[in-house]
Amino acid sequence: MAVARLALASFADGEVRLSDEVELYQRTYMTLLRSSGETQLRVLEPSHMAMGSSLHPLAASEELDLGAFIYAVRRLPDGIAGAELVVMGQDIEALSANGIPVEYWEEAEAAARRRRWYDSGTGTLAVLLASASDVDDLVPTLVAFQIEWNKIRGRQRAAGWPSETDAPDVPPEECARELGGSVDDWARLRDAWGESFGARMRLISERRLALRVRMLGGSHTGYDRLTRRWWAPVSAELAGEGLTERPLYFVSSNSHSLVNIVTGIAREREGELVTFIEQLDEHDILRHELTALREGDSPGSWENFLYFVARLYFTARGHEGWAERRAAEREKGVTHLRSKTALRVPAQVIPLDALDPRALDPRLGEVDAGALAASGAVIVNIDYPLGVAAYNILREIAVDRTGLRGVYVLGKAATLNADVGDVMISNVVHDEHAGSTYWLDNAFSVDDLAPDLRFGTGLDNQRAVTVKSTFLQNRSYLDFYYREAFTVVEMETGPYLNAVYEIADADRHPVGEAINFSKLPIDLGVIHYASDMPYTQARTLGAQGLSYYGMDSTYASSLAILRRILRLERVVGEVPGPELTRPSGTPTLPPDARPS
């Protein structure tokens, strides 16, 4: 089928320039990384500071920016503190061919970013990149980390602190008094570093950070190749279970919410989970929530409470708990597949006819057990990827499978007009990668989530912008989008929509055009939940994560997605129209459908 398009001048043509500083910074590191040699990271510091990133607003100031530092700390492995060189590549073979034997190095992890890191133990770190978005994400993170590390060191040396006679455990209050910054920020940094906090503070005082970076490879074909390797075990699982020719629903969300909703593992262990909570400290928030739920004083959901507690319960039991949970979920019809490539995106295969109707979350509605058993559909759910890896993944799936029936995207976003934990449903998405704007007939509205949204607020008819990196945006940049009513800032939807375009049309996805998605051969839904507020510095990704209460928006959204799939399969609720395409009316593209 043909997708309606309207050619428009792109931002790159000079009609609109969002930020010369951001563009200069990105161009600087991309050209430097083309070199086959090593690049001193410090050469990027001036352009990083000049950019005025909303995530690193104090980069050029002598004042510490602990929010940006904590953000970087959580997205880099511990070994970065002792590193001198960071080597980036697409696969182990490319690294080994260049004399970097990572297969013999120790694997490393970052707390808040799924990347495959390797630590030589002698000052060299290697990291595998899944897409070009990893470069846009990782390089500014490294620069921010180095800038703030050296600013902390400068203040330590000026204050002569800590001295050799000071206790090894450095209190956050003392850090704030001697170095500046808030006690809360130092406490969060201490939480991030754990028991090594005191030793790490001493290391900062002793060592000026001077990282070097080197890029090996980075071709489009290389990213396509690793995406194919990522998909291969999922495709093999579908073939091995006889699911190859079945209708497929693709969901990009997380690795826990859909599984909890369809398996009932947590609800089956209600007694054990309640006992587990009753044994926590009496001041623990979950103890208070349990009491409030029992007494009817909490608006929260009992099912969501059990899902949240189950994660803590199984985690507390270590590998035994993890193995028990995976086995139970497999028995309930969910197969987990872990990635061994640079694309660290776990996947789950969920055939609908393998599900037990009695185990489904009751909030889905009344289930027709016969229709569920007769459904030939299968859900492939993945943990949301980063940036343009989303395009690579969905395109690879669409090439390999002809029976794609629906695509649903659930992800985190920054909000310019709502609060953390709110849900945003957009019908316009501007993609900075391609410079195109998509006009959607979103499968979801607030009505689909409202019954299950207890703590947050639902906002539909929103406009989203897909950015290249959390760091590659500044205040003027955000102001520009806010004036154009683009209030949802995220990183994956644009690439997904580019892939959807190629599913629906004979051409490759366009660049710099407005695209009408009112008629598609598949069902399409996009939902975001607010995880940070860049207009409020204290409430950024570096400062606050989603808590127990923030989980409410995740489950309301996941329930809406699964309920939509089950309705399309005529398993629950009202049966939709006879075909999956959107209503025949084609809306006119408004003149302000994209930034102008």
Task: Give residue ranges: language-model regions.
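Accessory terminal and edge-of-domain segments that mediate assembly/interaction
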Residues: M1-S596
